[in-house]
Amino acid sequence: MSDALNRSSINSEKVTLRKAINKRLRTLDAVQKQNASTTISNKLIKLIKDNSSILCFSPIQSEPNIRPAIQHWLKSNFRVCLPKVEGDHIQSYTVNENDNLISSSMGILEPNPFNSIKISPVEIDFILVPGIGFTRDGKRLGRGGGFYDKYLEKTLPQTLKIGIAFSLQIIDTMRTENHDVPVDLLITD
């Protein structure tokens, strides 16, 4: 099979997987999401104990709410960063408890670059990576823009990439492409 046909086949499979997993996500009610999110936040707090640099994410409705973990790290004086989309890639910026986040064109809360410090990917110790789906061996199905893949390629080998998902987002297998960057660890409810 030619490379172009293979890429087309993989992309088609990813579209199908995204639809199937999004359908599963719609079965979670608010209480189930909150309980699962609390479990995930507690696991993250237990995992990341040392004062570290952490790239988190601002959860959207279909993602686990990790805000309690973020608040814990902020109060414990960790260097907490959030991603901001700039063109076709993301940059990490520091945030603090008093920061006013701004809404991106996609409705995601991002740091205001005018009152935040840009942090290089090589300065991050832990990266919390959202996704539509994950396999147990770390393959990640994102939203299709490649933003996280591009960012993760720039990190140091010792940076721990942690996939964050509800347990119903875990899939058995998935084909990937060369540019797809896996996570090192998966945290679910």
Q: Where are the language model's segments positioned?
A:
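N-terminal active-site beta-alpha-beta segment that forms phosphate/nucleotide-binding
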Residues: 2-123
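Conserved phosphate- and dinucleotide-binding cores of soluble alpha/beta proteins
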Residues: 4, 91-189
